[in-house]
Amino acid sequence: MGKLTDRVAIVTGASRGIGRAIALALAAEGAKVAVNYNSSAAAAQEVVDTIIAQGGEAMPIRANVSQADEARSMVQQVIERWRRVDILVNNAGITRDRTLRKLTDEDWSTVIQNNLNSVYYCTTAVMPYMIEQKYGRIINISSFVGQAGNFGQANYAASKGGIIAFTKTAALELAKYNVTVNALAPGFTITDMLAKVPEQIQEQIRARIPMGRFGLPEEIAKAVVFLAADGDYITGQQINVNGGVYM
């Protein structure tokens, strides 16, 4: 039996990259996993099929979690299937990188809506069930950019910094119900997003990282599993998984 046997988890943005790795890692420890996606149905189904092939239980759920009604509907579908929700991983996010001089109002609001508002919508959707259960683990995927800032990413930095502040307040309010709320702040991680960066720029970024390499999605997933399975007395914290790029 795994550390998370019979636990029910929702992972947003779970069809690829870090979200995919998190979904697979939670399932490997026995959790039943709702694999959320917005547009990548085939990729989400592949994650579900992989989990089932390994003896686990999972289902795909399409929801644009930047919309309150869709986030709540997603949670309701999980409750209808598995009667509970124990773990929420708020991972879904986007970028629209431009310097402040070129950033549009739409660039700003779209990133805030997708990255920050989605965390609020999903968290408040699972809260009543976790409070009733007297158990819950909420893990929000932030970024070192929310701590250090990054050129051309004012909107992204604000959204990820907001996640950290939200995490601390939610942790204060939910601790008495045995619901922990923590944030993970990854550094530069090998994902589709990083793959789009020109190789020359990647080398410049890698040179900034004390450990001399990019992170792996699986390394982020290991930290999520730790918080979900063993982090009973950890709440309101931001945990950096970044190779030392920000200390």
PLM region spans:
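Conserved glycine-rich cofactor-binding loop
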Residues: V8, S15-R16
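Substrate-binding pocket helix/loop in short-chain dehydrogenase/reductase
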Residues: T99-L100, D107-I112, L194, I205
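C-terminal substrate-recognition "lid" of short-chain dehydrogenase/reductases
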Residues: M127, Y135, R213-V241, Y246
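Alpha-helical segment proximal to the catalytic Tyr-Lys
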Residues: P128, L172-E173
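Residue(s) in the substrate-gating loop at a strand-loop-helix junction
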Residues: S143
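Short, small/polar-rich loop/turn modules that mediate ligand/substrate recognition or access, typified
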Residues: A175, T180, I234-G236
